[in-house]
């Protein structure tokens, strides 16, 4: 028996398509078999004893049973008898028909005779079998295979199953025909009933439609009448309203004309009153100006008398001025000669700096200090800067020695620097007592809200200004002070601390002579950015400029936890090579000291630059008289 045929047999038995067979499935398929036969078949096919027959178990067990019977030359009934020996029925087990010691060959004839008799007794009852089923060919093939398999019991049971199945199919066929006849009669009756209902519904719809149309006509007619009446009432009301509005408009026009006339009169009256007040005020001012003119006229008369007295004195001074102008011309000529000599000596200085030993042997000079050597080396690079300094220094303060050799004029810096800023000459920071001899450009820089503008106001006005607006761009201030007996003009450039103005600040750093870097001792973030500010200043300037680091708002240090300590600021200044001081713009502490320290540093740097180019500043104070001093002061 082939595998597809066995699979077809399994699918016929598995009507619910579960994939396995149970005892109940076999009982439904083979209702003619008793429980012993079903148990025998189920035990044969359930090889793993799981209580259900899988598809693979069914295929393998069925084919193995058929092949085993064919290989031993036994038919189906003989194989069943051989299996029954291993597991005999209850009535055979009770009678103990076979002896366990007997030979298997002696027992086989008895079993075969018993089964053959049982086969013939059951096959006689199923002589007439009808195989007219829907799958007749498959059933016939299966029937032939069962006949050839030599299992009469299965053949008889198969015949019974096919017979019962055919009988049930016949009954179902008759039942189906009966149901079809009933369905046809019911359908015909239903169609007649539906036709009657459709006719009734059509009649009802026609009546309802006619009634609705009539009601709609009546309603529309009534609404038209109501709308016509309402429109006539509204038209009459609108005519009345128009008449009232026209009357009110005329009344308003008359009222507006009257009000406009009154307004014109009031405006004219106001203009006249204002003109009258202006005339009175002008009259009072004229009286006041007249009195002031009279007093000024008297003062002018007094001044005229004084000027006449001074004129005679100035005539005497004119001769002195002529002599002084002649001396100035001589000094200018000397300066021109000195400048020419400086140009000539700059070339020799470059060679001298490269061969320091030869210069020292030539002039028998002692070894200069590192600071002086660096200043002399920078003098060559900053010659153009030094020539500009000549213009800012008063002419009477510049002296040249005609009898001194050129080399002694240039290399006299060591001796002149020894006398610079001696303790006896330091006089502090005071108000200026004359015109400025020097001018320094100082840039105020630092983060926003650290007190730069308050610092500047304390320097300029000597007072603290509260609630200053934020600086936008740059604010310029000028303060002339007297430092150690010299009048110095300090140009303070107050720059904005916001990040967006940083590029603008860099352009002012390039032209600055010094810088005041301010941080807030109560704001650690502003202190942390000090290093960046110093690097920005050094990158923006072409030469090294004096810088002072100022820690502002020390008056708030006690009330603010986590403020920057003074030692931290001093350490930062020492590491960056700048000056350091803590101040308070509120009470003015150390403001003047900070400005004094920076100004002295600026003056010292400028003195070194000037001396390195061969020009010596004369500390003598200018004479009070003279045309040149007056022109310089103006």
Curated annotation (Swiss-Prot):
Residue positions assigned to the propeptide: 632-634
Residue stretches in coiled coil:
169-310
Disruption outcome: RNAi-mediated knockdown results in defective uterine seam (utse) cell nuclear migration, defective utse cell outgrowth and irregular uterine lumen formation.
- Give the superkingdom in one word: Eukaryota
Q: Which residues form the EF-hand domain?
A: 5-33, 33-68
Q: Per its database record, what is this protein's job? A: Binds GTP and GDP. Plays a role in uterine seam cell development.
Question: So what family is this one in?
Answer: Belongs to the small GTPase superfamily. Rab family.
Listed NCBIfam families: small_GTP
What's the protein called, per UniProt?
Ras and EF-hand domain-containing protein homolog
Origin organism is Caenorhabditis elegans
Name of the gene encoding the protein in the UniProt record: rsef-1
